[in-house]
Design a protein with these regions (language model features):
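Glycine-rich beta-strand-centered segment in the early N-terminal region that forms part
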Residues: 26-53, 62-110
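Generic structural detector for well-ordered beta-strands
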Residues: 19-24
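NAD(P)H dinucleotide-binding glycine-rich loop of Rossmann-like/cofactor-binding domains
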Residues: 106-130
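Short structural boundary motif marking the start of a folded domain
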Residues: 2-7, 45
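Active-site/binding-pocket entry motifs
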Residues: 14, 53-55, 126
Length: 130
């Protein structure tokens, strides 16, 4: 898909806009194998991004104040239209517009169980980015 573009981190002070493949509604094979799971993603959705934000963490990576793997996609504060959904997604439908929280909450800690995912005790197990 020629219009599926992302901003990719190339190194301190360097980013590029690149075309990428349209995503599949599945867990990448290498991740599924490493985690001992199937590639099926019944709880997932695919969004067509309608707006994104340049976050401070993106700027820190680009300016060399923090590290980032070369090739990482930037932009993790997004709003998008649901274009595809897994068969176990219950409260979101194709065509819905939704915003994605900037943090990756664990869903298991005390705060998450109290629906305070914005202050998850185990937030962002990896790093910011898509």
């Amino acid at each position: 898909m020629a219009d599926n573009r992302v901003v990719v981190y190339k190194g301190p002070g360097e980013v590029a806009v690149e075309d990428i493949e349209y995503p599949k509604l599945e867990v990448p094979e290498e991740v599924a194998s490493a985690m001992g799971m199937t590639v099926e993603a019944p709880h997932a959705v695919i969004l067509r991004i309608v707006a994104t934000n340049i976050c401070g963490s993106d700027q820190h990576m680009v300016r060399g104040r923090t590290t980032a793997p070369v090739g990482q996609t930037l932009g993790h504060e997004i709003t998008g239209e649901v274009v595809e959904k897994g068969n176990d997604v219950q409260f979101i439908d194709v065509g819905d517009i939704c915003s994605v929280p900037f943090n990756i909450a664990c869903g298991r800690c005390r705060n998450c169980k109290e629906r305070k995912t914005g202050v998850c005790l185990n937030v962002n197990p990896a790093r910011a980015g898509s």
